[in-house]
């Protein structure tokens, strides 16, 4: 069964200010999930840049996927998940290990 964690992130970095607000991301993601009949087990919101590793909400999501609570991530755009090689590598590793089976983006 596909079980998704919805992840919305808005950076505090000035270069990333043009990205949709958290509320706008959530609205689009909820609509996408509803339209595609996706099972969302939780919604996680993070307000931090992804240029450096160590985001607490992202790391907790990774742990939950490793613990088989979910096997999919729903995010507004791939750059909401990772903008550094360590976090990107964690996503790739989970895909390789088949802990993470689904990455969905409405854009």
What is each model feature region?
Residues 1-107:
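Short, structured surface patches at the beginning of a domain
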């Amino acid at each position: 069964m596909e079980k998704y964690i919805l992840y919305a992130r808005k950076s505090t970095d000035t270069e990333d200010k043009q990205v949709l607000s958290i509320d706008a991301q959530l609205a689009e993601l909820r609509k996408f999930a509803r339209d595609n009949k996706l099972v969302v087990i939780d919604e996680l919101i993070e307000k931090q840049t992804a240029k450096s590793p160590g985001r607490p909400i992202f790391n907790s999501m990774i742990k939950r996927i490793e613990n088989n609570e979910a096997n999919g991530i729903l995010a507004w755009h791939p750059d909401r998940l990772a903008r550094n090689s360590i976090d990107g590598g964690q996503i790739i590793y989970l895909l390789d290990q088949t802990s993470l089976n689904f990455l969905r983006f409405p854009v």
